[in-house]
């Protein structure tokens, strides 16, 4: 028994050893077959790639038929065809294989602007073709070439290739999109349908954010206005009131939904009698909410208290059908944002007003410093200076009148009595008369002798000798002193700035530069400039030009007639509005050049 058991146990071990050798032999055979299959696949790939290269070389020839090109599409890839186009362009042949033309006059730029289509094209690829048709035909053929690898096309069927015919049109290149086209309604796949007005309030109430505290106000549809309540303070009373109003609003919506569901199941024969109590209940709830919200407004003005208490009297006795109550809500965050926008608008308005006032004050100071006595003489003539002198002398006489009135009164009394009004000349001395007589006799004798020299001739000779001496010792001309040179530079700067601004003004005023430039130059020559009062910005120079043209109406009838026209007045008014100024501000600046304003020395 023991020997039999041993033999039985040994047999399976022998069989296992034989089975292991067979498995190893089978796996070796499979590995060899797999290697042969991989080698065969590699040979096929290499063969297909070699054939594709041959096709590419064949496409580089001058004469390629249509049938051959259509057959080649199944044996090459898009990359092979791009290599074909590039190689043909290097050989100065058209990139389209069916075109035997040579490439001449190849453009050097990268982009082309088409004036017919108002588009920009990238002509990098277009340079490889002789015409737009060849470029478009080549791109069309390239798009039809299959992108499947060559060694996987055995199970696929060759696609149908269609080549473009002559006259189908061409393409200038790849279009460059400078701007994106706006999205139209047709581009949207599933547009949202418009929600009826009757369902908008219900949807907004159901989808509202529970965490937002709403500040509500009750208005009447009859007035077509919405009055937003002021933002309440963050205290316990306002928060409780907001939470209370929000909870009441949710309960009201839930109650309405429940009533609608019940009404859909059971008939309502007494509809009019049930609507009235519900409306009264809603009005009472809204009234209680408003009373809680208005507790924080006790410190406001009397007018605001009156407006806040007005809704109570309006809704205290609601009548069904006569008054439609609408509840308008806005979150506290939105109310704070709206309040910030209003503050920013007010600040911007205040800042613009301050800037305008600063501009006017700066120009006013500059005009006062510019104006001189020569300016007034140029504008109003030399009579202005004499009139000012007479007025000054008269004022001085009036001041001295208080001191000299007694002396003048005494002189008047003496003249009335016949006394001398002035002291007589003194009586000449006898010795002086005798000497003068001797001198006259001596001059008469010398005159008859021919040696007389009159004093007038002596004085004339002395003057000529003095002039000759001065001419002989005259200094050479010297350049301007620094102060004068700076003044000339400042005048030139002002004239350039004014000329630049006048070019934009004379057109709307129906004038030309030749009509005003001479008067402007003459007026600028009379100004007194410094290194600070000629520094202005472009809008300021334009306003200065308008002021000077208004001032020059005193000397130029053409300017006076032009500025008095309706179109000129409208243009100047619009210009002042753009600068946030008024017409009276321009008038006040012009008045600075009137004689009534004293000249700064």
From Swiss-Prot:
Top-level EC class as recorded in UniProt: hydrolase
Subunit structure: Associates with the RNA polymerase II complex.
Lineage, top ranks: Eukaryota, Metazoa, Chordata, Craniata, Vertebrata
GO BP of this protein: PERK-mediated unfolded protein response; snRNA transcription
Binding positions for Zn(2+) per the UniProt entry: 94, 99, 130, 134
ZnF (RTR1-type) intervals: 71-154
Pfam families named among the record's database cross-references: RPAP2_Rtr1
Gene: rpap2
Annotated Basic residues bias: 9-20
Biased composition (Polar residues): 297-313
Keyword hit for Methyltransferase: no
UniProt subcellular location: Cytoplasm; Nucleus
InterPro entries with a match to the protein in the record: Rtr1/RPAP2 (IPR039693), Rtr1/RPAP2_dom (IPR007308), Rtr1/RPAP2_sf (IPR038534)
Keywords on record: Coiled coil, Cytoplasm, Hydrolase, Metal-binding, Nucleus, Protein phosphatase, Transcription, Transcription regulation, Zinc, Zinc-finger
Protein name as it appears in the record: Putative RNA polymerase II subunit B1 CTD phosphatase rpap2
Catalytic activity: O-phospho-L-seryl-[protein] + H2O = L-seryl-[protein] + phosphate; O-phospho-L-threonyl-[protein] + H2O = L-threonyl-[protein] + phosphate
Region (Disordered): 1-36, 221-278, 297-317
GO cellular component: cytoplasm; nucleus; transcription preinitiation complex
Principal location listed in the UniProt entry: cytoplasm
Annotated function: Protein phosphatase that displays CTD phosphatase activity and regulates transcription of snRNA genes. Recognizes and binds phosphorylated 'Ser-7' of the C-terminal heptapeptide repeat domain (CTD) of the largest RNA polymerase II subunit POLR2A, and mediates dephosphorylation of 'Ser-5' of the CTD, thereby promoting transcription of snRNA genes. Downstream of EIF2AK3/PERK, dephosphorylates ERN1, a sensor for the endoplasmic reticulum unfolded protein response (UPR), to abort failed ER-stress adaptation and trigger apoptosis.
Family, similarity comment: Belongs to the RPAP2 family.
Enzyme Commission number(s) from the entry: 3.1.3.16
């Amino acid at each position: 028994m023991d020997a039999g058991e041993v033999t039985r146990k040994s047999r399976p071990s022998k069989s296992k050893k034989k089975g292991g050798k067979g498995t190893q032999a089978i796996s070796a055979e499979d590995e060899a077959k797999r290697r042969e299959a991989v080698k065969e696949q590699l040979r096929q790939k290499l063969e297909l790639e070699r054939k594709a290269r041959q096709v590419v070389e064949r496409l580089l020839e001058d004469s390629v038929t249509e049938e051959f090109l259509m057959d080649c599409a199944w044996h090459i890839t898009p990359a092979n065809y791009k290599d074909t186009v590039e190689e043909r362009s290097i050989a100065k042949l058209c990139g389209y294989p069916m075109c035997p033309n040579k490439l001449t006059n190849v453009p050097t730029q990268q982009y082309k602007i088409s004036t017919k289509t108002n588009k920009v094209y990238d002509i990098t690829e277009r340079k490889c073709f002789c015409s737009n048709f060849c470029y478009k035909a080549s791109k069309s053929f390239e798009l039809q070439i299959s992108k499947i690898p060559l060694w996987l096309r055995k199970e696929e069927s060759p696609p149908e290739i269609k080549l473009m015919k002559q006259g189908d049109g061409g393409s200038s290149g790849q279009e460059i999109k400078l701007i994106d086209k706006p999205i139209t309604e047709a581009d949207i796949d599933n547009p949202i349908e418009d929600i009826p007005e009757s369902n908008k309030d219900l949807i907004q109430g159901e989808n509202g954010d529970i965490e937002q505290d709403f500040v509500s106000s009750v208005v009447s549809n009859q007035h077509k206005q919405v009055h937003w309540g002021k933002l309440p303070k963050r205290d316990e009373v306002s928060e409780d009131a907001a939470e209370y109003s929000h909870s009441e609003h949710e309960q009201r919506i839930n109650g309405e939904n429940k009533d609608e569901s019940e009404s859909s199941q059971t008939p309502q024969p007494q509809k009019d009698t049930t609507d009235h109590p519900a409306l009264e209940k809603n009005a009472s709830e809204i009234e209680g909410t408003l009373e809680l919200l208005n507790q924080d407004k006790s410190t406001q003005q009397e007018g605001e208290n009156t407006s806040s208490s007005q809704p109570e009297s309006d809704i205290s006795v609601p009548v069904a059908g006569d008054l439609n109550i609408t509840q308008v809500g806005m979150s506290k965050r939105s109310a704070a944002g709206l309040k910030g926008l209003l503050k920013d608008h007010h600040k911007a308005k205040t800042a613009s007003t301050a800037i305008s006032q600063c501009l006017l004050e700066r120009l006013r100071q500059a005009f006062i410093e510019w104006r001189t006595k020569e300016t007034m003489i140029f504008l109003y003539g030399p009579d202005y200076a004499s009139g000012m002198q007479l007025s000054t002398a008269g004022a001085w006489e009036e001041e001295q009148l208080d001191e000299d009135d007694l002396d003048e009164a005494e002189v008047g009394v003496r003249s009335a009595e016949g006394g001398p009004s002035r002291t007589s000349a003194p009586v000449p001395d006898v010795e002086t008369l005798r000497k003068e007589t001797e001198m006259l006799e001596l001059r008469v004798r010398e005159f008859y002798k021919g040696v007389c020299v009159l004093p007038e001739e002596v004085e004339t000779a002395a003057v000529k000798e003095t002039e000759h001496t001065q001419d002989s010792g005259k200094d050479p001309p010297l350049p301007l002193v620094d102060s004068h040179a700076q003044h000339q530079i400042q005048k030139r700067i002002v004239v350039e700035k004014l000329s630049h601004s006048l070019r934009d003004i004379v057109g709307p005023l129906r004038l030309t530069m030749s009509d005003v430039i001479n008067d402007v130059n003459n007026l600028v020559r009379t100004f007194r400039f410094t290194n600070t009062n000629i520094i202005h910005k472009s809008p300021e120079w334009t306003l200065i030009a308008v002021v000077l043209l208004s001032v020059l109406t005193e000397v130029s009838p053409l300017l006076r007639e032009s500025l008095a026209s309706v179109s000129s007045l409208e243009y100047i008014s619009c210009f002042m509005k753009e600068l946030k100024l008024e017409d009276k501000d321009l008038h006040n600046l012009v008045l600075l050049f009137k004689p009534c304003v004293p000249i700064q020395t």
